[in-house]
Amino acid sequence: MIDLKFLRENPDAVRESQRTRGEDPALVDALLEADASRRAAVLAGDNLRAEQKAFGKKVGQASPEERPALLEGSKELAAKVKQAEAGQHEAQAALDAAHRAISNIVQDGAPAGGEDDFITLETVGEIPAFDFEPKDHLELGESLGLIDMERGAKVSGARFYFLTGFGAMLQLGMLQLAAQKAMANGFQMMIPPVLVRPEIMAGTGFLGAHSDEIYHLADDDLYLVGTSEVPLAGYHSGEILDLADGPKRYAGWSTCFRREAGSYGKDTRGIIRVHQFDKVEMFTYCKPEDADAEHQRLLAWERDMLAAIDVPYRVIDVAGGDLGSSAARKFDCEAWVPTQQAYRELTSTSNCTTFQARRLGVRYRDENGKPQTAATLNGTLATTRWIVAILENHQQSDGTVRVPEALVPFVGTDVLKP
């Protein structure tokens, strides 16, 4: 949730953020109204309780003759207090609903617009110039015994797959390398739960406009996570952290689940867009004033991992209309996919400022010992989709695929052969 104090002092900035996202700026006025109503309800309730307390003293000091009338007045006042408390609860509920309807405030400098309005910050590496007709990742995966979509569909349905043989080793090796790099950079490795409570899913901002993307186990009222960002954000919910020595960094290795409800007909071939995949995700808690620098560090660590798999990629500054509700700024790294003649997302790193931590009650103590809301950030370090870029960019004319040097010790071979 956004900071209500900031909203009261800078309503136009929040309206502009809504416009940058392509969302309704009128929601800002609705929140301001709900905030004013709740504050008025609190004041009215406080005044009535003060009056009730003073009246109680008066009753205690009254003569026997005066007391019956005063007691009657006390009952009337108690009824008014009860009514005021009900109004206060109602006003708080209305405020909470209006508050949750507003997305995080987009950072200055982020481009406005939608999915296609990103800004390319840098392009890295040479696009391969094949002297043969390249195969796509699925054709390579099937011919080399790495990917089995047919049996995945037989067992689980569309957008499921088996990684087999060296395909499984390629993923495990990639994730293991990511884990090693994360630990070398000061992250604590975590294997988190992949089922979370509704308040944790809501706290991270995933139960908003895109909640239909999430698998829900209704009988247990638990949600399957689409990223380990969710349980890692909930890890310190309701806590006050010690950030005196710098950010707290965690790297979560988990299976992730997405319904892809809004992706009918998109990327139906292969493993680019699937219901289940594995990922190593970086997650950071830090002081708000350190968040921008931490965001750049997360991006640098992602780029270091991309350098290890040796694929051409570009870095983009994602437009406001393509940000998730929790993100104030997001940078994506997109790898070149030769058979699509396009760049496709491999990593994403988001600065969520204090938005998630405010919902989840994650705080730290400032230099005066006063609790303040922390900032949270996240970033992809490796995921199943990377196999697409590795296979397509490192394929050879004889149908084999060269394994990136950094992955050879994990995979157990330097060339993937039929």
Swiss-Prot record:
GO terms for biological process: selenocysteine biosynthetic process; seryl-tRNA aminoacylation. Pathway: Aminoacyl-tRNA biosynthesis; selenocysteinyl-tRNA(Sec) biosynthesis; L-seryl-tRNA(Sec) from L-serine and tRNA(Sec): step 1/1. Keywords: Aminoacyl-tRNA synthetase, ATP-binding, Cytoplasm, Ligase, Nucleotide-binding, Protein biosynthesis. It is found in: Cytoplasm. L-serine binds at T227, S228, E229, E281, T380. It holds the Pfam family Seryl_tRNA_N. The keyword Protein biosynthesis applies. Its EC number is 6.1.1.11. Consists of two distinct domains, a catalytic core and a N-terminal extension that is involved in tRNA binding. Catalyzes the attachment of serine to tRNA(Ser). Is also able to aminoacylate tRNA(Sec) with serine, to form the misacylated tRNA L-seryl-tRNA(Sec), which will be further converted into selenocysteinyl-tRNA(Sec). This is Serine--tRNA ligase. It comes from Rhodococcus opacus (strain B4).
